[in-house]
Amino acid sequence: MEIDDLDRKILSLLIEDSRLSYREIAKKLNVAVGTIYNRIKKLEDMGVIQGFTVKLNYEKLGYELTAIIGIKAQGKKIREIERIIARDKHVTCVYDVTGEYDIIVIAKFRSREDMNRFVKSVLSVDGVEKTNTHVALEIVKEDFRLEP
């Protein structure tokens, strides 16, 4: 199935406010509520919509530190290392990348002690050769809501 202009408009509205009801979306797009229901169901079935969530301000929840961590790992262990790291509650993103490092991790911490424990735990994972941690001084933009 293909995603058309109406699907993209629905997605744009949901990206802005995932609490919108089918009725509100239908009214904004001037289409039937049933159409909106069917389209959203189709987008879920296709895996385009993977859930509905809220956008949080992590600093207001006490997560003062954002770390970007480059990890050099043994090639045959990369996938296993990524899975182990992805399970940690501090981790928001794990990327398998090209370049100097094999893995890039974005994680949020409430304290330097939490970050220190995390980095040391990463270094103890079998196959991790080295890490390089950068702490964000200011978050200028942090928004994964791209226009569909």
From Swiss-Prot:
Residues 22-41 bind DNA. GO terms for cellular component: cytosol. The keyword ATP-binding does not apply. It holds the Pfam family HTH_24. GO terms for molecular function: sequence-specific DNA binding. InterPro entries: ArsR-like_HTH, AsnC-type_HTH_dom, Dimeric_a/b-barrel, Tscrpt_reg_AsnC-like, Tscrpt_reg_AsnC/Lrp_C, WH-like_DNA-bd_sf, WH_DNA-bd_sf. This is Uncharacterized HTH-type transcriptional regulator PF1734.
